[in-house]
Regions:
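Bacterial N-terminal signal peptides that target proteins for export
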Residues: 1-8
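Short edge beta-strands and adjacent turn/loop segments
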Residues: 59-84
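Long, charged/polar, surface-exposed segments that mediate recognition or autoinhibition
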Residues: 86-114
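C-terminal motif of bacterial Sec signal peptides marking the signal peptidase cleavage site
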Residues: 17-19
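A mature extracytoplasmic/lumenal domain signature
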Residues: 80-84, 132-136, 146
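Post-signal peptide N-terminal segment of mature Sec-exported envelope proteins
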Residues: 29-49
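A short amphipathic beta-strand at an alpha->beta junction
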Residues: 104-141
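Bacterial signal peptide processing site
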Residues: 21-23
Length: 151
């Protein structure tokens, strides 16, 4: 159960990158919704670069190893490493499935709770994806993809 808490806490740390919960103004929402694909890509690359400068950090349990923008589907991709879990093999099949379900559920809940992130996804048509890795670099769960339809 302690490992589950660590996994959920890393997700909360990663989701803090979304900023404050104030939300976008009406003008910002309109600007986001009127962007074409090239403009969305430019903003996405700039956002990923800014997030890399401010959010690539490390604490006792987690490390945000990379934040990048994937232009093919307008997605900000976070790569997180849980330092206390050496390998996915420490979980049996039932525990891994439960971990996967919990990470997906909590991830969607936290991202959708944040107004800025929700506005960015709904009006800007962006998505967020989290890849959670063990200390050895192997995936702990399937990628957690959150889009506007999840909110």
């Amino acid at each position: 159960m302690n490992k589950m808490f660590v996994c959920l806490s890393v997700l909360a740390v990663a989701l803090a990158a979304g900023g404050c919960r104030g939300g976008a103004s009406a003008q910002q929402k309109q600007d986001l919704s009127h962007m074409n694909a090239r403009q969305r890509d430019k903003v996405g690359y700039e956002a990923a670069a800014n997030l890399r400068r401010t959010e690539l950090k490390e604490d006792a349990d987690t490390r945000v190893t990379n934040i990048r923008y994937r232009a093919s589907d307008d997605t900000l991709v976070y790569t997180l490493m849980l330092k206390k879990i050496s390998s996915p093999e420490v979980f049996n099949a039932v525990q891994r499935r439960k971990l996967d379900v919990t990470l997906h559920k909590e991830g969607r809940k936290e991202v959708c709770r944040n107004r800025n992130m929700r506005d960015l996804m709904i009006h800007g048509r962006y998505s967020v994806e989290y890849r959670v890795l063990a200390r050895n670099g192997k995936a702990l769960s399937s990628p957690i993809r959150i889009s506007a339809k999840d909110c």
